[in-house]
Amino acid sequence: MSTESLNSLSDKELHRKLIQSGFPSTPVTETTRAVLIEKLRKHTRADKLKKRSNKYVLYSKEQQESPPFPQYHQYHAPQPPQNYANGLDNNNDLDQTGGSSAYNRSLDESDSSPLQLSASKMYAPPPVVASNYDGDCSPHSLGLNGKYLQPCSMPYAIDTSNNYGKPSGKAKLSDGGVVNRLLSFRDTTIQRKFNYPTGQASRIPLRKERLTRFALSDLKSFIRNPDIRPYVIPRVLISLFLIFLTIITVLYVGKRFEQSPIDKAALKYTLCNPNDMQMISEKVNCIEKDSLRGALDMSEELFRHLNERARLHHCKDANLSPALEIGEFVREMVSNPKTHRGNLHSNLMAAKYLITENPQWSIQVVDSTKHLGQTSHFELSEPNLPLKCIVLKKVTRFFTVIGALLLIVAGFLIVYVAVVIYRVKQKEALLAVDQFQKDIINELIYLSSQSESPEVVINQLQEKFLPAKKRSKLLSSWNKALKQLEKNDSRVLFGMVNRDGKAMRTIAWNRNVDKKDVGLVKKWQSPAFDNSNKIANPPTPCLKIRHMFDSSEVDQANLKQSIVESIIEKVGTRCKICDVQLDVQSCCVYIRCASEEDAGTIHKEINGWWFDKRLISIKFLRLERYLSRFPKPSAEPLYFHTNEAANTHS
């Protein structure tokens, strides 16, 4: 495991790796992480070297005879290879590096019993691991000069009755055969895995076998990986489905559309009795046995002609008729050299009979007596068309139907949108006309209160209320508003004036109309906010109210009375008003109530309301300030009750 992979591990994973490697449980922190990673890396490298040193080469030697003490030839060590990157491959190729070579081994008679082998199979360490043995007399130890040292005795014998080697004696700790004794307990299948045939074996089949085995194992692990299954399985299923559709398409495309539906096994007919006399007529009720084959052949030929005509009609040109006249069919049959002309008429009559008796052929005989102006002809009701033609026809029909439906739906949508747009435009025009009327009346009232000559040129009002960008759009609404005012409103006067030699139309407010009836009646509209900020404990009984009237209404004789009536309309009989004063300079209303609670009631009911398109605001005023400003009250104290308020409104 590389240092980069160890660095990418989390603290928990590194702690688990350390415990698995035999290290004590040590907490992983920022200061100890680098040291622990270095220890784990060294430990991993040492394990790899140890595993390489424990790999052995399996060799076997066929014994022709079984002497009590088998002898081995002298081993001449070849030149050692330059690179031992892979211990297993180097060990396996040991017998191929130096041509023909053998091992020289002998058994000590005084220390061990004879080794009974039918086919000697044992593990020998490679030359590079000779330093792993402590003893100098190990049977597998190799000196520095490349030759084996003096062999030692084998501490065990192998039982040939089963597949496992059984120890025959206690091995000394100093003996080098302990590894062989431990390896003898392994399954013989593992030994066969590394057992090579005698002689110079080629490495190419072995490598191919390994590559195949590794590829299969990688494929199995790839398929069994739970992280890959959610991504691989849907794609595999989709691929299989596409393959299935491709196969079905190929089968349908490869199917011959000219296949005749005439099945001789399911044929319906009645044979004529030769003893009965047959009357010569166009109507045939039975068929002779001799004419059956010829009638079937003619029926098949007729189906081919009709199917070809149907293909041309449905797939090429719809103007071509799919029907085939009997005379034309007879001429085509006569022109065919294979047709026997002698029995052509009888075969044709028999074919008509078979067509009538077998409606599953989808061949129709249209008689001329039923359709005036037409000759007798054949027609195929259900032709066998090619798949391409069928698909094209279905798609064309589908899009034709869908297109027609889309056109109908689009037509309805266009009509609906047009109606909605028309209604919206009409509503906007009506609102614009109404707004223009209100603006004109308010402007005329204001000009009438400000100047003595109330006449205004209509073009000036038009330039004021119609912006230059929207003038063309709102001009029709402006003209409608003027027409309605001229026709229905008597408060507005229209006239003509000559200015600079040009006649201009004017509009003015009629001052002769009673001001109380001209739309200046005080009227409450709606509150601007809720009662969350109302004052619970009013400090004084005096109030100062703003925006109940403006400077244009100062000259009205009944202004004070209308304001008092509007206040009584809101508060009713819940409070008593002692005095009401109007300040025409600041356009404010001053009220003095009988108590602080009465002033709080007026403040609660009126403050924050819209009154004649103006927002009312109220402020409490100290009694001393009120008396200093208005030392003299009104002539009569204003104590209003329910009946009095009703009388004022009536």
Swiss-Prot record:
Entry membrane topology: Multi-pass membrane protein
Knocked-out gene: effects: Loss of maternal and zygotic activity results in a reduction in survival at each developmental stage, with mutants rarely surviving to the adult stage. Adult escapers display held out wings and exhibit wing patterning defects with thickened longitudinal veins, a varied number of anterior crossveins, branched posterior crossvein and folded wing blades. In adults, climbing is impaired and their climbing ability further decreases with age. Males are sterile and females display reduced fecundity.
Main subcellular localisation: nucleus
UniProt xrefs under CDD domains: LEM (cd12934), RRM_Man1 (cd12286)
Transmembrane segments: 231-251, 401-421
Residue ranges that the UniProt entry lists as topological domain Nuclear: 1-230, 422-650
Record SUPFAM superfamilies: LEM domain, RNA-binding domain, RBD
Name recorded for this polypeptide: Inner nuclear membrane protein Man1
UniProt organism field: Drosophila melanogaster
